[in-house]
């Protein structure tokens, strides 16, 4: 209810001061909190039209576009954020991780992650992204090192455990891979705290666990 009241006030404020980029930005964030993504994108775009020198606006618009499935638009806005602020570690991480998810430009993805980690060397999510890039490059041992390091600096996270399972599986460590996926499944089905809303698909996790179990049985 407090968020809804705040949203109502911001709508009135924007109507009174339509040329305030800060008010449009605040309204976009309020819509984001209400999961009204289209309206959030609309007002973040208006904030940028009024002030195109704010790297944070480009980053937030990019994140909103990624959530909406507009990956091309998301990546373009991340690049613009980096143009304005070459040390924008979150934008570097975002771009690098998106390249890794798509499985292309992995060398460029690596460049972005190393830049992100230059400013935040103990950011567990950046280390996870770096590990995932190594995994996509077929360098599973390097990937394992980075994921294990990532887990030191983060709270238990289902996505990280899913990644850990995939990496261990690629190294034919089926027992530990199954354990990692079981942890991911538990955290997915019993969410606690703010995990950013990202969760693996439980059905896919269960299939992975079954596959690992079958391979373990075959090895006996």
Question: What kind of region is each of these model predictions?
Answer:
Residues 16, 50, 84, 119, ...:
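Structural marker of alpha-solenoid helical repeat scaffolds
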Residues 21-22, 55-56, 89-90, 124-125, ...:
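Helix-start (N-cap) detector for alpha-helical repeat units in TPR-like alpha-solenoids
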Residues 29, 63, 97-98, 132, ...:
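Residue-level recognition of tetratricopeptide repeat
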Residues 32, 59, 66, 100-101, ...:
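Position-specific recognition of the canonical hydrophobic site in helix A of tetratricopeptide repeat
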Residues 104, 163, 175-220:
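Terminal, low-structured helical/coil segments at or just beyond the last alpha-helical repeat
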């Amino acid at each position: 209810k407090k968020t809804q009241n705040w949203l109502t006030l911001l709508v009135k404020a924007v109507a009174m001061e339509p040329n305030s980029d800060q008010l449009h930005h605040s309204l976009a964030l309020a819509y984001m909190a209400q999961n009204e993504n289209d309206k959030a994108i609309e007002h973040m775009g208006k904030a940028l039209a009024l002030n195109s020198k704010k790297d944070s606006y480009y980053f937030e618009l990019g994140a909103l576009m990624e959530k909406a499935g507009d990956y091309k638009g998301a990546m373009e806005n991340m690049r613009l954020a980096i143009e304005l602020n070459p040390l924008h570690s979150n934008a570097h991480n975002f771009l690098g991780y998106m390249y890794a998810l798509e499985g292309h430009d992995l060398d460029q993805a690596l460049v972005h992650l190393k830049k992100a980690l230059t400013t935040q060397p103990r950011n567990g999510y950046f280390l996870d992204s770096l590990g995932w890039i190594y995994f996509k490059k077929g360098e599973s041992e390097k990937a394992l090192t980075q994921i294990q390091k990532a887990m030191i600096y983060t709270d238990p996270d289902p996505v990280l455990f899913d990644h850990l399972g995939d990496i261990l599986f690629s190294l034919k460590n089926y027992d530990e891979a199954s354990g990692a996926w079981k942890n991911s499944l538990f955290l997915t089905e019993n969410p606690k705290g703010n995990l950013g809303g990202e969760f693996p698909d439980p059905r896919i996790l269960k299939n992975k666990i079954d596959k690992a179990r079958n391979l373990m049985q075959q090895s006996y």
